[in-house]
Amino acid sequence: MAGMDLALKAKLQKQRYHIVGEHGGVKTCHWTKESLLRDRQCYKGKFYGVKSHNCMQMSPVVDQCNLACTYCWREPHMDTLELTDQDPKELLYESVRAQRRLLSGFGGNPKVPREKWLDAQNPKHVAISLNGEPTLYTRLSEYMDLCHKHGMTTMLVTNGTLPKVIEKLDTLPTQLYVSVDAPNKKVFDEVCKPKWNTNAWDKFSETLDLLPSLDTRIVCRHTLMQGINMSDQHIKEFAALDRRADPDYIENKGYVFVGHSRENLGVENMPSHEEIMDFSNKIAPLTGRKVLSDSRPSRVALVGQEITPIPIPEPTMFFPKDLGIAPSVKHLQMAN
């Protein structure tokens, strides 16, 4: 296995990623920091009862994706595809050790309650959403099973273009997010930009039809871009896709003009919160649902039938007492 491109690895480390194994990575979420420092919660706390200081944001493949979405603010991924089969237990334990390393500086901060910081050392939620397309990790099912056995929820975010992988998962995530960012094939090809597979929209469509059969919580997430996918006609087309998928929830989240996406989109593509709410109020009745909540700081609205907290599994396995903390890493320095 060749491993991660060194130039990309250097960029990610500069952005405070802790690289785990050949392709995995962990990064402290903005809202984890906000929870520790100012007792603020992200929208997952308001919508699903997720405590931000207990959430670990990671990906088994931070450098691998089969799409090149215009709205993605992450660094561009590798141009070649290299599937990873890292041992799930190693990935989980090293990710937790990395999370502890990333949070270590908060332990001595007088603004951070000591008990809360100690509680954060053992995550209760794993957001498999940091970067890349996690369904490219060949042992994803085993990894999520281990998370559940350690008393942690899993929140998997996928672009939905690999339906066979999702269909064959022996262990499903606690909550499965599918990015539904285009209402039709034309917008999909323009916005999501498949790298290799010309049938990506067809595969994505297969995933939508698969979702109703999956015994887990399903979320369809629409990333809203003004002037691109928010017209009244787009809303009708999105609603048709949502009715096929029949998710528990629909999240309407506004695009943010940050990171690499600034090379593809403009600040004018950022919808206001009022525009996000207008979209949500229009799509809700078309899907037989209602607007349940919203979060202005996170630029998102929730559509569904009712809010139910995400269930945390009872642990049957425990981290070793001597698991410890990942060592500090000397970042790569690449020539300009």
Model-flagged regions — what are they?
Residues 53, 121-123, 295-299:
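Short Gly/Ser/Thr- and Asp/Glu-enriched loop/turn motifs at secondary-structure junctions
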Residues 109-274, 282:
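Conserved AdoMet/S-adenosylmethionine-binding subsite of the radical SAM
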Residues 65-68, 185, 257, 310:
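Short, acidic Gly/Pro/Ser/Thr-rich loop/turn segments
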Residues 106, 216, 289-291:
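Surface-exposed helix-capping loop/turn segments at secondary-structure junctions
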Residues 1-71, 75-80, 84-101, 304:
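Flexible, acidic/Gly-rich N-terminal and inter-domain linker regions that tether
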Residues 90-120:
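Short Fe-S-cluster ligation motifs
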Residues 2-16, 271-281, 286-336:
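C-terminal accessory extensions appended to soluble enzyme cores
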Residues 95, 99, 103, 208-211, ...:
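Hydrophobic, Leu/Ile/Phe/Ala-enriched alpha-helical segments that form helix-helix packing faces
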